[in-house]
Amino acid sequence: MDSVEKGAATSVSNPRGRPSRGRPPKLQRNSRGGQGRGVEKPPHLAALILARGGSKGIPLKNIKHLAGVPLIGWVLRAALDSGAFQSVWVSTDHDEIENVAKQFGAQVHRRSSEVSKDSSTSLDAIIEFLNYHNEVDIVGNIQATSPCLHPTDLQKVAEMIREEGYDSVFSVVRRHQFRWSEIQKGVREVTEPLNLNPAKRPRRQDWDGELYENGSFYFAKRHLIEMGYLQGGKMAYYEMRAEHSVDIDVDIDWPIAEQRVLRYGYFGKEKLKEIKLLVCNIDGCLTNGHIYVSGDQKEIISYDVKDAIGISLLKKSGIEVRLISERACSKQTLSSLKLDCKMEVSVSDKLAVVDEWRKEMGLCWKEVAYLGNEVSDEECLKRVGLSGAPADACSTAQKAVGYICKCNGGRGAIREFAEHICLLMEKVNNSCQK
């Protein structure tokens, strides 16, 4: 079961929710008032991800790469693939964030400096967005820092709003944590239990736990936002699975989130296939791109032993590794590396060569992975089932891939990509077993 959406829906005459700090910008009311004339149009539900450039905890956190994907890309992929929204937007004040949002297929609202301050609230930015978009009746405010969000979560919440008549729905997670009052010197010198009786301390399996907001999303109708609330009216919570409830705030959260998203994240509509072949560009991936020439005019290259181990790791997993280059590399020099990989050099059309290898092995494109770093790799990167690029690859290559390594070419990028492939293949195998 993907999630639990039980819980009493609370109806209130005066909306109560999380008030904004300070006075939000005045909202221009929607002329439609949420109702159409004649034939009534379905309410316009817009996904809105707030992503300002001035994050204090982690600079440009919203587009920092998590498991090879810009952080904001994880929630954009889930929102777009859910099919639950009439439009998907990113509200930002930063050019780089705008470019990433557009690459993933989102529309961009350029937020003003007035709602981009450290003191600005989410509500301020949402109200400004609505001022420019009278067509929007419902806003699904999705947090960019929740990378394990899945389309099914968003589909079910959209149904709760549209079909079950809720005015607001927000995400929660169930936790089994005992809470104690804080000790304050001079005021309270001893602590007291807040949600348990220590004399009858329950076992985890005997206790339902408590519901906490996990911050993944807040859906609210326009009329609530007009009154300054994201939670109110007829409201309900949506309980997310614990493994999907990931929030990134500070640096220490990053490695934990990375491991979680690799195992529980959403990787797209198409099911991953088992990779059978990895093709790797030589110059700039296997090597760092530097070429040394000896006194007798012999070509000398260097590579990282970690990358050789990565290649060996893939071979042990049954994945063939082949090398390719558009340059007239010395096959003798490459053979001396003892990688035992088939290779083609002086290649003018890399896609044609990879296609020939694919057919020779009886594979579909989804069973091929490619690690590239140059413009000449672009077509291959776009065609294969799994694509990657070193951290120092050209911008054309980086825009075409699904995974960007932390390591540079010739400095561990192949090993990193190999580990990424193995993790995804573990995910594929687990899915098949289920």
From Swiss-Prot:
It catalyses: an N-acylneuraminate + CTP = a CMP-N-acyl-beta-neuraminate + diphosphate. The modification Omega-N-methylarginine is found at residues 37, 52. Ubiquitously expressed. Expressed in pancreas, kidney, liver, skeletal muscle, lung, placenta, brain, heart, colon, PBL, small intestine, ovary, testis, prostate, thymus and spleen. It is found in: Nucleus. InterPro entries: CMP-NeuNAc_synthase, Cytidylyl_trans, HAD-like_sf, HAD_sf, Nucleotide-diphossugar_trans. It is an enzyme of class 2 (transferase). One of its GO terms (biological process) is glycosylation. The modification N-acetylmethionine is found at residue 1. GO terms for molecular function: N-acylneuraminate cytidylyltransferase activity. A motif (BC1 motif) lies at residues 15-31. Substrate binds at residues 52, 62, 111, 120, 122, 143. One of its GO terms (cellular component) is nucleoplasm. The active site is at residue 201. A motif (BC3 motif) lies at residues 269-276. Its EC number is 2.7.7.43. A motif (BC2 motif) lies at residues 200-206. Pathway: Amino-sugar metabolism; N-acetylneuraminate metabolism. Keywords: Acetylation, Methylation, Nucleotidyltransferase, Nucleus, Transferase. The BC2 (basic cluster 2) motif is necessary and sufficient for the nuclear localization and contains the catalytic active site. The localization in the nucleus is however not required for the enzyme activity. PANTHER family: HAD SUPERFAMILY MEMBERS CMAS AND KDSC, N-ACYLNEURAMINATE CYTIDYLYLTRANSFERASE. Homotetramer; the active enzyme is formed by a dimer of dimers. Belongs to the CMP-NeuNAc synthase family. Catalyzes the activation of N-acetylneuraminic acid (NeuNAc) to cytidine 5'-monophosphate N-acetylneuraminic acid (CMP-NeuNAc), a substrate required for the addition of sialic acid. Has some activity toward NeuNAc, N-glycolylneuraminic acid (Neu5Gc) or 2-keto-3-deoxy-D-glycero-D-galacto-nononic acid (KDN). This is N-acylneuraminate cytidylyltransferase. It comes from Homo sapiens (Human). The lineage of its organism: Eukaryota, Metazoa, Chordata, Craniata, Vertebrata. The gene is CMAS.
